[in-house]
Amino acid sequence: DVEKRNKALKKMVLFTLIMAIICLIYMLVTSYLSEKSKFVIDLSTLELVQLEEPEDGDPIAVIDTSLGEIRAVLYPEYAPNTVANFTELAESGYYDNTYVFHSEKGVYSAAGCLNKNGDLPDDFDKSRELVERELHQNLWPFKGALCSMTTTFKQSFGQRFTGGGTYYCGSRFALLNTVDITDEMKQQIFDLSNSEKLTDAFAEKGGVPNFSQQIVVFGQVYEGLDIVEQLSELKVEENEGSTKIPVDDVMINSIKIDKYSSEKTEKEAVE
């Protein structure tokens, strides 16, 4: 009997040890994946390219709306797949006569949808709505940022337990205005980034800091900021949904992809 009890005790100790090792491995893997998924900013290489003027030859989007024209420089070097998707859709005429379907009071507007309520059409091209989210430390949600809106989030079976997953973006885009950048918010930006340069940029330019490294920024408006402001101040319908649909139709008439020319810009300014 004593020998049986000893064997049973050894089995119990061995089982407990094995379970402890499994739990430890699980915790280490989870911790590793969690750390791996965090977005790290390298302050030594941080370049706030949106604060710079476009250079001759840079790709731009000329967005013609029913309220006026917006011009934005694009950043294929930082968000290549997003810019390619947007460019191909624009050049195909997809955005012609699409709706500004959301206006968040003073903060941002969302546009580029065939349906007024922002829903994708039944026959939408799934490949256009499954562009993996591209974040870059040089791109931030400053005022005038041109952003790609998130369409879906996918997780594998294992990721449901360990965390992680993949966000995808698509055809619809957002134009950011700004929230009130208070002293408290500036302190929060600095505490999270440890970057005076980034904090000062938000303070001077404005934007939506809460979107930082959450939304894909792929362009920056350099002409037509007054139109961006108007688009975020539209009168909207009263409804229980999350989409704040403008009462009056505001349209994206067309989007033309072009190259920036300082000479052309100077001539237009004179005219």
Question: Which residues fall in each region the model found?
Answer:
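Cyclophilin-like peptidyl-prolyl cis-trans isomerases
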Residues: 1-271
